[in-house]
């Protein structure tokens, strides 16, 4: 990794080397905008299990040249089989998504997708072990100053916070505006236990692309199809908050997950048990799930936010990464308009970021509300005590046009980076 000097100056400083930050970095690279990604971790290691990439983010990833990789290493969703305990409820067709929106919904290993974005951004532009502790945006100054925990100083024409649900950028930004310097997230009362498996050798071609939702009496478990009949499973159960300062558990194991789900029914288990799937996991994780309570301004002065740093939401509709990618694309349009100007100025930059803010905030609120509503429906808590009945009506009785109508605003919105529309789609 490149080491920053005390006077490092670039166009854009991106705080956070996750999906959103690296996507923005890759776009900046193609647009000729200089950038530096500041990642607090000391190394890039496998984290998480799977990731969902839906049509609303795939046009941007195609512009970056990543669609061929996604098609090779990801699995398009074809069907969803739904069970109540071990009783079949319905089989939902999902092939229509490709036909209607031009892209399927893909499940792919998170780490492999992260590595592709990392290489696309350029490791030489990523500073590891770079924890941001202060951001100074003085309106009359020519640049925004960033200070790291080890004392290094960096400067950029703007700073982008892409540092996740417990965003340091957001806390610093709030404090500079005289607001409480804390993220406004709340615990949802749910713990997610997830894993990504080796191929399930007993499954066949007919099982490829088939997702599974199982509604148990006291919890739920979904599994998403990945390449070669691998499974990305997500168990959801009610729980007490273990640590208010972090989301991920430090020591998640297969045994912990099997204690909760092991003896439960799963149609893809070799013996129709969840443990048959969990025991084939390459890695597992567990996390307490938080979501946003108050939406911050997605830009203030010369500082902007993308992804979970601005609008963390539940993962039930698989839109966390998709929304971060949408943000990155829309922000890149604002940045290109600024840097391509004949007479750029700090005031013009603030105006471009304000336009970005207004474009993205309404969309983020819509997707957040959709995700929250779907989570309540999925867990049988929507309009409680009517929740279980409403869930049955939605997933057993509702005709396909209901799915089309619900998902069209979500998947039909497909932003692009305007300056890359005619560019060849290659890394």
UniProtKB/Swiss-Prot annotation:
UniProt-listed Enzyme Commission number(s): 1.-.-.-
SUPFAM superfamilies xref list: FAD/NAD(P)-binding domain
Pfam families in the record: FAD_binding_3
Enzyme class: oxidoreductase
Function text: The subsequent chain release by Dieckmann condensation (DKC) could be catalyzed by the TE domain present at the C-terminus of pyvA and/or the alpha/beta hydrolase pyvD, installing the tetramic acid moiety.
Top-rank taxon, per record: Eukaryota
Organism annotation: Aspergillus violaceofuscus (strain CBS 115571)
Cofactor(s) the protein needs: FAD
Keyword Flavoprotein: yes
GO molecular function, one term: monooxygenase activity
Pathway(s) this gene product operates in, as recorded in its UniProt entry: Secondary metabolite biosynthesis
Name the UniProt record assigns to this protein: FAD-dependent monooxygenase pyvC
This protein's UniProt keywords: FAD, Flavoprotein, Monooxygenase, Oxidoreductase
Binding of FAD, residues: 39, 110, 308, 321
Statement: the UniProt record of this protein carries the keyword Flavoprotein: yes
Family stated for the protein in its record: Belongs to the paxM FAD-dependent monooxygenase family.
């Amino acid at each position: 990794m490149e080491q920053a000097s005390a006077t490092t100056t670039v166009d854009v400083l991106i705080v956070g080397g996750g999906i959103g930050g690296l996507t923005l970095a890759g776009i900046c690279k193609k647009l000729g905008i200089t950038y530096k990604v500041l990642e607090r971790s000391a190394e890039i290691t496998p984290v998480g299990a799977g990731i969902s990439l839906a049509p609303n983010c795939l046009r941007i990833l195609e512009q970056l040249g990543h669609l061929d990789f996604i098609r090779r290493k990801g699995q398009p969703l074809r069907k969803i089989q739904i069970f109540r305990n071990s009783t079949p409820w319905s089989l939902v067709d999902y092939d229509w998504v490709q036909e209607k929106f031009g892209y399927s919904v893909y499940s792919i290993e998170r780490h492999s997708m992260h590595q592709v974005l990392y290489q696309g951004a350029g490791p030489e532009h990523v500073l590891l072990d770079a924890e941001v502790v202060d951001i100074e945006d003085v309106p009359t100054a020519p640049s925004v100053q960033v200070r790291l925990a080890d004392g290094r100083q960096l400067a950029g024409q703007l700073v982008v916070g892409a540092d996740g649900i417990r965003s340091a950028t957001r806390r610093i930004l709030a404090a500079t505006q005289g607001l409480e310097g804390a993220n406004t997230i709340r615990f949802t009362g749910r713990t997610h236990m997830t894993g990504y498996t080796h191929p399930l050798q007993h499954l066949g071609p007919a099982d490829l692309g088939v997702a599974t939702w199982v509604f148990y009496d006291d919890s739920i478990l979904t599994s998403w199809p990945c390449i070669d009949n691998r499974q990305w499973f997500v168990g959801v159960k009610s729980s007490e908050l273990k640590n208010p300062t972090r989301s991920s558990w430090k020591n998640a194991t297969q045994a912990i997950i099997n204690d909760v789900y092991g003896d439960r029914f799963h149609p893809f288990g070799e013996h129709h048990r969840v443990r048959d799937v969990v025991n084939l996991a390459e890695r597992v994780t567990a996390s307490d799930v938080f979501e946003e309570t108050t939406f911050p301004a997605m830009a203030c002065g010369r500082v902007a936010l993308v992804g979970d740093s601005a609008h963390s939401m539940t993962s039930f509709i698989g839109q966390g990464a998709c929304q971060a990618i949408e943000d990155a694309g829309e922000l890149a349009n604002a940045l290109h308009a600024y840097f391509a100007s004949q007479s750029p100025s700090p005031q013009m930059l603030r105006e471009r970021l304000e336009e970005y803010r207004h474009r993205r905030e309404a969309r983020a609120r819509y997707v957040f509300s959709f995700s929250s509503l779907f989570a309540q429906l999925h867990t049988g808590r929507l309009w409680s005590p009517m929740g279980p009945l409403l869930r049955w009506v939605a997933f057993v009785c509702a005709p396909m046009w209901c799915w089309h109508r619900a998902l069209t605003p979500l998947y039909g919105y497909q932003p692009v980076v305007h300056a890359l529309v005619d560019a060849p789609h290659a890394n």
